[in-house]
């Protein structure tokens, strides 16, 4: 069973999000594998698709643990490796490719991963203490996959700022239920970049937040003639 787990983990980690896109530095836009420009919505769906795959893999690891097919150490190691790969990949998309990633960017991802690993350690302690039922454990592990979206948004905001965007607007997902915090952020309309927290931050939705952000450049003031 350990060999099966290792093979499955390798397959998950080898599924790279950046195999489906490239970033055009000149236009500041993404292209698909055929060279066609991708919309912002398409890029976000690409991230969501990868997160869904990560969540499925984390749930599978957790079911294997519940069924006694793997040990707690094996489960924790597989979860850590999956989260590490997914957060790095999401950040790379957010920053517009590996060329946009420097030591500072990798440092921010490292800090984020340390926080996630600390949460995971508490999760492990709860499992050891038999404080979680199987449904509770499966629901909780899903939140770790959803947290990957935050690494994308962190990178995207920095990239947009570097490209001269100075305004932002929170956009609600019409298909999702939003908390009062997110409704309040969206109601503020277009504001200065950095005024609003990124999706998943400072809101009751947390990692499940389905908001997006759109960025705008400040239009120069016109003087009437």
Language model: regions and residue ranges:
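Domain-core detector
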Residues: 1-208, 214-225
């Amino acid at each position: 069973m350990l060999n099966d787990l290792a093979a499955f983990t390798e397959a998950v980690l080898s599924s790279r999000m950046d195999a489906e896109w490239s970033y055009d530095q000149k236009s500041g836009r993404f292209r698909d594998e055929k060279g066609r420009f991708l919309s912002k919505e398409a890029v976000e769906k690409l991230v969501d698709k990868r997160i869904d795959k990560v969540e499925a893999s984390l749930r599978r690891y957790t079911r294997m643990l519940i069924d006694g097919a793997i040990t707690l150490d094996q489960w924790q190691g597989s979860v850590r490796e999956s989260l590490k790969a997914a957060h790095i990949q999401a950040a790379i998309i957010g920053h517009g490719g590996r060329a946009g990633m420097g030591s500072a960017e990798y440092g921010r991802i490292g800090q984020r991963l340390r926080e996630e690993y600390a949460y995971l350690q508490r999760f492990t302690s709860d499992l050891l203490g038999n404080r979680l039922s199987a449904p509770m454990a499966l629901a909780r592990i899903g939140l770790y996959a959803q947290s990957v979206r935050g690494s994308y948004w962190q990178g995207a905001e920095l990239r947009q700022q570097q490209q001269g965007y100075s305004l932002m607007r929170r956009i609600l997902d019409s298909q999702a239920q939003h908390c009062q915090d997110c409704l309040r952020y969206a109601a503020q309309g277009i504001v200065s970049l950095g005024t609003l927290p990124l999706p998943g931050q400072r809101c009751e939705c947390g990692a499940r937040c389905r908001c997006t952000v759109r960025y705008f450049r400040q239009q120069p003031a016109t003087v009437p003639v």
